[in-house]
Amino acid sequence: MTLLALGINHKTAPVSLRERVVFSPDKLGVALDSLLQQPLVQGGVVLSTCNRTELYLSVDEQENQREQLIRWLCEYHQLRPEDVNGSLYWHQDNAAVSHLMRVASGLDSLVLGEPQILGQVKKAFAESQRGHSLSSELERLFQKSFTVAKRVRTETDIGASAVSVAFAACTLARQIFESLADVTVLLVGAGETIELVARYLREHNVQKMVIANRTRERAQALATEVGAEVITLAELDEQLVQADIVISSTASTLPIIGKGMMERTLKARRNQPMLMVDIAVPRDIEPEVGKLPNVYLYSVDDLHAIIQHNLAQRKAAAVQAESIVQQESSDFMAWLRAQSAVETIRDYRAQADELRAEMTAKALAAIQQGNDVEAVIQELTHRLTNRLIHAPTKSLQQAARDGDQNRLQILRDSLGLD
């Protein structure tokens, strides 16, 4: 048995190829069934995200295993091997173990240290569990990888610093306000960045969130998800008065929030401070707003400066995380190698126990026939000793005849003679 990881990701393939090898969630069970029908495959997990598609497998080692698995992948997705060969990577045993641990820990992600990948790995694992597609070795490997990811999160600062614009905006808000539970947040726009911001804020217990957008329909689905109120941009002036934090990201070509609007807002708020984060390009908030008293305005460039600093911190933390992965992958491989002896140990113990039972039965029968107990015990121990040392003795003699000093030393170690 050998462990394999086969796949493509954002480093090795463009999106035009990655999208052609995606396994859709609703057909993943069918894909796993097809994969396990391959004669060499004992167990499998399929991880498929926007940035990577990977197969984690336990297989019966064969000379042409790589060709067989690539052929299956291509046939399933109606591709030719030459379409993917230049983009595929292949890891075996220790390299496969390390790769999964790095993936689960966010060390192989487009955004270094991002936490979402762990949930995606867990989801892929759960799908294989439901379909009974796991071998015992794969199950142990994935459980171990989850533990490693947790260690990396708790023992390093890999996830402590914001490295996306959305996350940086939320981190800034958390740094300025002691508690987000008591503030009102106004989100302007309803695109992907605002979606991420809204989810981050909800995770940090923001109770009052308002989403302002040109159309209510686009914002409503997000508002329902995060428990926010929806308004149109026409209502923005009125809502600004209530907002402690404003985060804006629209596709507008002109500023939406101007200096005059904010002067009226501050007057109505009696100059209570406001945090404003403009992550739109072109800008949604006139730069002059940042000169007003009690307004703390940050642009996307300000956030990028924060991100670059934090990315450097994450890279430093990644060195420590890689050390954890190296240690844990070595430990797992030691466990895996030990499993190859389990069946032999079980057979050896069963053989010894069978011999014990046989000799005990003969000794008891002899005693019941009136034979001297001491003589029976002496005979029992003599026969038991001879039977137990017979096979090792033959192996020692054969190793000596062959002049195999290495084997002789292994046998001496096994018998506890050194």
Curated annotation (Swiss-Prot):
Top-rank taxon, per record:
Bacteria
Q: Which GO terms describe its biological process?
A: protoporphyrinogen IX biosynthetic process from glutamate
Swiss-Prot/TrEMBL site (Important for activity) positions: H99
Enumerate the residues binding substrate: T49, C50, N51, R52, S109, E114, P115, Q116, Q120
Q: In which pathway does it act?
A: Porphyrin-containing compound metabolism; protoporphyrin-IX biosynthesis; 5-aminolevulinate from L-glutamyl-tRNA(Glu): step 1/2
Residue sites binding NADP(+) per the record: G189, A190, G191, E192, T193, I194
- Return one GO MF term: glutamyl-tRNA reductase activity
Give the enzyme's main class according to its UniProt record, as a single word.
oxidoreductase
- UniProt-listed Enzyme Commission number(s): 1.2.1.70
Q: How does it assemble?
A: Homodimer.
Share the domain note from the entry: Possesses an unusual extended V-shaped dimeric structure with each monomer consisting of three distinct domains arranged along a curved 'spinal' alpha-helix. The N-terminal catalytic domain specifically recognizes the glutamate moiety of the substrate. The second domain is the NADPH-binding domain, and the third C-terminal domain is responsible for dimerization.
Q: PANTHER family in the record, alphabetically?
A: GLUTAMYL-TRNA REDUCTASE
Tell me the protein family, please. Belongs to the glutamyl-tRNA reductase family.
Q: What is this protein called?
A: Glutamyl-tRNA reductase
Gene (UniProt):
hemA
